[in-house]
UniProtKB/Swiss-Prot annotation:
GO cellular component assignments: chloroplast thylakoid membrane; photosystem II
Protein name: Photosystem II reaction center protein M
Gene: psbM
Originating organism: Sorghum bicolor
Assembly mode: PSII is composed of 1 copy each of membrane proteins PsbA, PsbB, PsbC, PsbD, PsbE, PsbF, PsbH, PsbI, PsbJ, PsbK, PsbL, PsbM, PsbT, PsbX, PsbY, PsbZ, Psb30/Ycf12, at least 3 peripheral proteins of the oxygen-evolving complex and a large number of cofactors. It forms dimeric complexes.
Annotated membrane topology: Single-pass membrane protein
Role according to the record: One of the components of the core complex of photosystem II (PSII). PSII is a light-driven water:plastoquinone oxidoreductase that uses light energy to abstract electrons from H(2)O, generating O(2) and a proton gradient subsequently used for ATP formation. It consists of a core antenna complex that captures photons, and an electron transfer chain that converts photonic excitation into a charge separation. This subunit is found at the monomer-monomer interface.
Family: Belongs to the PsbM family.
Cellular location(s): Plastid, Chloroplast thylakoid membrane
One BP term from GO: photosynthesis, light reaction
Amino acid sequence: MEVNILAFIATALFILVPTAFLLIIYVKTASQND
């Protein structure tokens, strides 16, 4: 079973992009509350 590098990159981006987006929103909200 070969590892499809493009599928791996797509999966990594699919996970990292929303995570980074949520982290940015969290940091902005935390700084506003402070």
